Amino acid sequence: MSSPAPLWSFGDGLSYTTFEYLNAHYSAELVHPSDTLIVSVSLKNTGSVAGKEVVQLYVRDVVSSVVTPVKQLKAFSKPFLQPGEMQTVVLKLPIQELALYDLSMKKVVEEGEYEIQIGTASDDIRLRRTIFVGRQPVTSNSICHTAFCMHDLVKNPVRKIQVAVCVRDGE
């Protein structure tokens, strides 16, 4: 029987040099569906020879109304760096690219948390940050979903809700 894990992850490859992902700057932590998130990553060639690195931006939808992939590649760049050189790599993510088809088959960008992952391969994530798409982030005193918040139930106690859960293995 074979394992569901791939032999080589997406983005896996060989290099004669090494790279360090030092930090990332995000244009915003709260974005709207019409926005474009800009992520700037500081990349340094820490090896002794020049080389190229594929900097990849993945997105993970933390909570979704429908089943979504564990992570999706949304942007990448392949800079060339000399030994010891540091470069800022800019990746752009139009938030509309997070759209999915909901249960009523409408294409929507759901409000909620999305984890932005920066790495060299799908299984080699170096930097992570959570952003929030929508009007306001989830707070500790309200349990929110795209169409309903718990504080709405307190205002309208006769309202009925249906709760659905999707559990994922892995990340």
Name each model-derived stretch:
Residues 50-57, 68-69, 102-103:
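Short, hydrophobic/aromatic beta-strand segments
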Residues 36-38, 86-90, 126-128:
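Intrinsic-disorder/low-complexity, polar/charged segments enriched in Ser/Thr/Lys/Arg/Asp/Glu/Gln
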Residues 1-52, 58-60, 83, 111, ...:
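Secreted, periplasmic, or luminal enzymes acting at the cell surface/secretory milieu
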Residues 94-140, 149:
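Terminal connector regions
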Residues 65-101:
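Intrinsically disordered, low-complexity Pro/Gly/Ser/Thr-rich segments with frequent PxxP/GP/PP motifs
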Residues 143-166, 170-171:
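Compositionally biased low-complexity segments at domain edges in trafficked proteins
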